[in-house]
Amino acid sequence: MSVTSWGKCSIFIQPVGSAKNEWDKLDTPKEDSTQVTPTKGDTMTQTEEGGGTVDRKTKKSTYEAAYQLFIKKGVSQPFKTIDGVVEGNYRLAIQPEDPELPGVYMGNTTVGAEEAFTTADGALITYTHSALIPDGDVVAKTINKKNEDVYCAYRWRVIKATKGAGGKYALKFSTPQAGETPPTEIEETYTSV
């Protein structure tokens, strides 16, 4: 078993608002192409005469996940693209090689695609998921200091995948270990079982 969330990952997608716990598992991405890039939010500073800092506030960070899939004979791509645009919003779960470790969860993303070709790699599509705030998504929920529900664009979650009928997967999510607090399973409700 691993100590960190590295190695060959599994990527799962689901349209936002799906009625069933059915996720598609994507083909194995190109080696070392899967990554999440955070962009730190802008910092706003109020200064007084003489340059002293009165107050400082940092805006929320933004997140993008990207991976490359080979265009293979007989293997369909996960998204229909029109000049790099993918219609609809998708949930994204990236499970590390060791499923006991936390993986990436984005509860609402827009998806873009960049199609490319080289003689070294052949045909590839780079898919980029830009994370949005997933209002009402219990997997993305946390509670702030005011005891209010807050929905995060990016969360660490332990992801358990079970293969079901028709090549679909059912995913269960847990919070990761936090100090002495053990992982807690997150209960999702779907409108159709």
Predicted regions and their residues:
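Solvent-exposed edge beta-strands and adjacent loop segments
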Residues: M1-I71, N108-L124
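Mixed-charge, glycine-accented linear interaction segment located at domain edges/termini
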Residues: Y105-V193
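A short, compositionally biased
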Residues: T4-C9, V85-Y90, G166
